C-alpha cells in the first residue's frame, strides 16, 4: 500500500513567551502528516500555526498544540511539528545571546520511529 506524506515547511509565525511576555520571533514551522483518508487544504496548516501562536505560549506547547489540532482535523495519528525561532527573553534580556535559535520537535505515530520520515522533515 502506498503511503503519502504531506509537509508544509518554513511557515512563518510568532508568539509571546508566557513567562516574560517577550516576543518569540523569526519562527519557522514545519508541519507534516500522513493522511488517514482525509487531506486538508494547505492554507489550513498555516492558519492553524497562526491561531496557536496568537496567545501567550511556550515554544514546546506551540508544537504540541499544532500536532493536537492536526490529529483532530485529519484523523491521523502520524503528525510531526518542528519549530525553530528566536526568543527575545534570551536575546534582549538576561544572558543577551542574539544568535541562539531554539528548536523543538513533536513527533507522533509513524514519525516517532521511522528515520526516513524524520529525514523528510528537514
Label every model-predicted segment.
Residues 16, 40, 102, 106:
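Residue-level signal for pocket-adjacent positions within structured domains
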Residues 50-86:
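Well-ordered alpha/beta subsegment
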Residues 78-122:
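Short terminal or interdomain "cap/linker" segment that borders an active site or interface and mediates
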Residues 19-64:
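Histidine-centered catalytic/metal-coordination loop motif
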Residues 15-18, 91:
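Short helix/loop capping segments that flank catalytic or ligand/cofactor-binding pockets
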Residues 8, 26-30, 78-80:
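Broad gene-expression machinery/nucleic-acid interaction feature
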Residues 2-6:
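Short, small-residue-biased leader/transition segments that mark boundaries at the very start
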Amino acid at each position: 500500500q502506498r503511503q503519502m506524506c504531506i509537509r508544509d515547511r518554513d511557515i512563518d509565525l510568532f508568539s509571546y513567551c508566557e513567562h516574560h511576555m517577550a516576543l518569540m520571533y523569526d519562527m519557522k514551522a514545519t508541519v507534516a502528516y500522513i493522511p488517514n483518508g482525509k487531506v486538508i487544504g494547505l492554507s489550513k496548516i498555516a492558519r492553524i500555526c497562526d491561531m496557536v501562536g496568537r496567545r501567550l505560549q511556550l515554544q514546546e506547547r506551540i508544537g504540541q498544540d499544532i500536532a493536537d489540532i492536526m490529529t483532530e482535523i485529519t484523523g491521523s495519528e502520524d503528525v510531526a511539528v518542528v519549530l525553530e525561532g528566536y526568543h527575545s527573553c534570551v536575546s534582549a534580556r538576561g544572558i543577551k545571546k542574539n544568535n541562539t535559535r531554539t528548536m523543538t520537535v513533536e513527533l507522533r505515530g509513524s514519525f516517532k520511529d521511522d528515520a526516513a520520515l524524520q529525514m523528510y522533515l528537514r
